[in-house]
């Protein structure tokens, strides 16, 4: 149940930052995403059997990886906002970037918790698509070329 709430929250925040083009809303959504990720991390550390779903299971290694992902994710989001402030990027590109970043972290969390090889493969491919959106968020010719080079 907790994983379903996490997925709904992350995809809801990703849709929010994509459709709402406001600087303050992006900050609030990023803070909420960090809180959701920290809450999931806390639940996994406190109760290892929090996920009783068929396809997902937490073990010691997944706890370590999700903790590292949470720390990396929070620092990435902070660094992204510093980068956007220095660059004076528009809110459309920022929304695409943040939505892709939120979904990327959700997919990586799913990869670490996956107990089924098919789900693992689907989520690993979803991370590839999210990373390609992160590469192409500038929407210029160089970004397009880099995205195609990433795929092939």
Predicted regions and their residues:
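Transmembrane helix-loop-helix hairpins at membrane boundaries of multipass inner-membrane proteins
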Residues: 1-99
């Amino acid at each position: 149940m907790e994983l379903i709430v996490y997925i709904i929250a992350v995809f809801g925040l990703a849709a929010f930052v994509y459709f709402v083009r406001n600087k303050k809303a992006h900050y609030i959504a990023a803070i909420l995403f960090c809180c959701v990720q920290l809450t999931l991390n806390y639940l996994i550390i406190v109760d290892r059997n929090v996920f009783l779903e068929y396809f997902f299971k937490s073990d010691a290694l997944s706890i370590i990886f999700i903790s590292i992902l949470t720390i990396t994710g929070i620092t990435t989001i902070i660094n992204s906002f510093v980068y956007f402030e220095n660059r004076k990027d528009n809110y459309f590109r920022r929304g695409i970037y943040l939505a892709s970043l939120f979904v990327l972290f959700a997919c990586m969390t799913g990869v670490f918790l996956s107990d089924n090889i098919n789900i693992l493969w689907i989520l690993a491919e979803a991370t590839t698509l999210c990373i390609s959106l992160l590469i192409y968020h500038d929407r210029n010719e160089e970004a397009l070329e880099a995205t195609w080079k990433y795929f092939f």
